[in-house]
Amino acid sequence: MSEAITPTAMKTLFTEARTHNGWQEMPVSDETLREIYDLMKWGPTSANCSPARIVFVRTPEGKEKLRPSLSSGNLAKTLAAPVTAIIAWDSEFYERLPELFPHGDARSWFTSSPALAEETAFRNSAMQAAYLIFACRALGLDTGPMSGFDRQKVDEAFFTGTTLKSNLLINIGYGDFSKVYGRLPRLSFEDACGLV
């Protein structure tokens, strides 16, 4: 059994971490992006399917390519962020299952059911996006996840001719706390949970 993490770590990952809308002018290195991935990849997915594929948009040219897909409320903060991660899912993720899950013929579970494959890829890539957020926080970075964008435009701009489809965007950098909104409430245990 693992030991509980420290209260300080809990604050870093959960209770004092915030969604950021403004960014300090501090770059995020490619080495740091590798560190983020090398942490997040260990988060669990069903049958170790690991369907998420990530494009780290970090150049002015990349941001301009992303611009037409962004909602007006997400435009300025995304263009200002050092990095925007496009979290996508591979619609043919199951082709890697003989390598990732060699305990049986897991590939056939999904080749025989396209609907199951899509549902599995979308759900598990969303889980992996959460792991990316926690990996960023563990490394001292801040994030701003967003679903306010045109997925079709992102897919056309970045994934034409591939098996990838976008799920969500996550801005990554060193946040400007002066631009953080006031802390919003969360649902209580009684409101959100049941015991049976």
From Swiss-Prot:
<comment type="similarity">
    <text>Belongs to the nitroreductase family. HadB/RutE subfamily.</text>
</comment>
<dbReference type="InterPro" id="IPR023936">
    <property type="entry name" value="RutE-like"/>
</dbReference>
<keyword id="KW-0560">Oxidoreductase</keyword>
<dbReference type="InterPro" id="IPR029479">
    <property type="entry name" value="Nitroreductase"/>
</dbReference>
<comment type="function">
    <text>May reduce toxic product malonic semialdehyde to 3-hydroxypropionic acid, which is excreted.</text>
</comment>
<dbReference type="GO" id="GO:0019740">
    <property type="term" value="P:nitrogen utilization"/>
</dbReference>
<dbReference type="InterPro" id="IPR000415">
    <property type="entry name" value="Nitroreductase-like"/>
</dbReference>
<keyword id="KW-0285">Flavoprotein</keyword>
<protein>
    <recommendedName>
        <fullName>Probable malonic semialdehyde reductase RutE</fullName>
        <ecNumber>1.1.1.298</ecNumber>
    </recommendedName>
</protein>
<dbReference type="GO" id="GO:0035527">
    <property type="term" value="F:3-hydroxypropionate dehydrogenase (NADP+) activity"/>
</dbReference>
<keyword id="KW-0288">FMN</keyword>
<dbReference type="InterPro" id="IPR050461">
    <property type="entry name" value="Nitroreductase_HadB/RutE"/>
</dbReference>
<dbReference type="Pfam" id="PF00881">
    <property type="entry name" value="Nitroreductase"/>
</dbReference>
<dbReference type="GO" id="GO:0006212">
    <property type="term" value="P:uracil catabolic process"/>
</dbReference>
<keyword id="KW-0520">NAD</keyword>
<keyword id="KW-0521">NADP</keyword>
